[in-house]
Swiss-Prot record:
One GO cellular component, as annotated: cytosol
Species: Clostridium botulinum (strain Hall / ATCC 3502 / NCTC 13319 / Type A)
Subunit structure, interactors included: Monomer. Binds 30S ribosomal subunits, but not 50S ribosomal subunits or 70S ribosomes.
Phylogenetic classification of the source organism: Bacteria, Bacillati, Bacillota, Clostridia, Eubacteriales
UniProt-recorded Gene Ontology molecular function terms: ribosomal small subunit binding
Name this polypeptide is given: Ribosome-binding factor A
Role, per record: One of several proteins that assist in the late maturation steps of the functional core of the 30S ribosomal subunit. Associates with free 30S ribosomal subunits (but not with 30S subunits that are part of 70S ribosomes or polysomes). Required for efficient processing of 16S rRNA. May interact with the 5'-terminal helix region of 16S rRNA.
Keyword Cytoplasm: yes
Compartments, record wording: Cytoplasm
Keyword Zinc-finger: no
Amino acid sequence: MAKYRAGRINEEVKKEVSNIIHNDIKDPRLSAMVSVTDVNVTKDLKYAKVYVSIFGNEKAKEESLEALKSSVGFIRKEVGRRVKLRNTPEVIIEVDNSIERGMHIDELLHSIKENESNDN
């Protein structure tokens, strides 16, 4: 039962944080495409680690990350207003590079396949 509740809370917080980032944060530094990939809320509901994937050049990534980190208070307030929980979790922004790593692995596999077809 507890696992099911934790999963529901994680998904609800993920949905709301994504909506807040895309619709409510008006920071001009948030120019790169930001995707919320996962959220892990601790069992005591005190902390929520929000994993984001940021697409764009390095400068845009850094600026977007700074914008997100400076907006954690606003994000927390909005999550508390939109998701009815006993405690509003402290939001911690973490960068998730798994999508970029997956794209890199896909490129490597594609180049290996091309090399094998050229050898034959």
